[in-house]
Amino acid sequence: MAEAIGNGTGTDKKVMVAIDESDCSHYALMWVLENLKDTITKSPLIIFVAQPPATGNITFAASLGVARMYYPISSTPGYVESAQENHRKFAVALLEKAKQICASHGVEAKVVTEIGDPKTAVCDAVEKHDINLLILGERGHGTIKRAILGSVSNYCVQNAKCPVLVVKKAPVQVA
């Protein structure tokens, strides 16, 4: 499997999983740890979290989930700095949790976070870190919601400079 990934040579294949607070991101990370273990034991798995630019909400980590607080948009530099610091803390907490999960599976992980719109931040990180395979979870938005809001996975499939694997969580079967 390792030789099939990207255009790297030998053991320098770089795999990156882009995550957020969603269940589908957690599922994608677990899928990688269970299905690509041979590939990701040769070089560290890169885990990426995009920090949204400071806007009208503050996000902070709550275990594996997230809690969001909304506040009026203000041009006060203090608000912007506070919001960005909270986004950074959230990203670091999420990355540390993901790194612990990787360690519990015997996989070395390198964590990366950047500020920016998740769509472009992920693609920029792919280029910056010379990634050979990008893995994302699929959130499962419907056609209309995806058309209105856009889709990080769709954007990355079209714009990332490496192969992209979108991991779709299997639907729960009701007995």
Segments from the language model and where they lie:
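Small/aliphatic-rich secondary-structure junction motif
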Residues: 2-78, 100-105, 110, 159
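Glycine-rich, Arg-bearing micro-motifs that act as flexible, cationic patches
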Residues: 14, 133-158, 173-175
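Eukaryotic short linear interaction motifs
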Residues: 25-26, 54-57, 62, 120-121, ...
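Gly/Pro- and small hydrophobic-enriched strand-loop and loop-to-helix capping segments
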Residues: 40-44, 167-173
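Short, hinge-like loop/turn segments at secondary-structure boundaries
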Residues: 63-65, 128-130, 153
